[in-house]
Amino acid sequence: MRGNSFRMLPFLLGASTAALAGPPFQTDDPEPIDFRNYEFYTFASSDGTPLETDTAGPALEFNWGAAPNLHLHIIVPAAAIFPADGPRAFGIGDIELGIKYRFIQETKHRPQIGTFTMFEIPTGSAPRGLGVGKTWYKVPLWAQKSFGPWTTYGGAGVTVFSVPGYRNYPFAGWLVQRDFGKKWTLGEEIFYHGPEGPLAPQTRPSTLVDVGGYYKFRDPGFQLLFCYGHSAVGQTENYAYLGLYWTWGKKADTDKPGDQDKPAAFRSPGGRGQSSAYLP
């Protein structure tokens, strides 16, 4: 971020995450990975305005299905900032921890609903602009429904700061994606965030339109994730994500409603954190 701040990116996602649902999109979803399953990502992402471009990468993300309907999440990013009128900086960014919990299951006529609370730990250098300097939070609510090869999900939340120069701001997004054969899944999202404060590059609201998806090298265990988007309304902003995804673990006993034709681990890679949901 400009001055003593840093804006870490997700994904699409989503939000990163999320999985894609989450990575690579900025909008996230409520679906945790299966119990006793694991996900690993390595990725790079970028978010830029006329004031500054912030990047993450290489970054590492790990998700663990710690209990039914709940997974734990961590991202450790290398970070870089490129201000339009100041010195560049490189180093470790703020580490992200998260808990995704689904409290309403999907049925034939009802979407699944859950939350993905995130805690950004101040490991990045605030004086160099690679971190905020204090722990900050994301508190969202997400919903998802599947119809054959189609899946739609979205929701809204608030990012909470306690640091001068930053302000609490709302965010919201919605995405539609479709499977094309056995290899491709493509989607498009609309994602909004409010102004983030005078120390952030995102000083005004912005609404972005992002397009991306996944290519399965091995179904479902190894995938390529990609996304690019640009603002349609508000402050000029660009978003990009490119990553690799692996999943492994105990096979789920039963498929979730609406997902009978999809491998358990592929239903939605991860759950967007800095990698797939939108973060400052």
Indicate where each model-derived feature is located.
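Transmembrane beta-barrel domains of Gram-negative outer membranes and organellar outer membranes
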Residues: 21-280
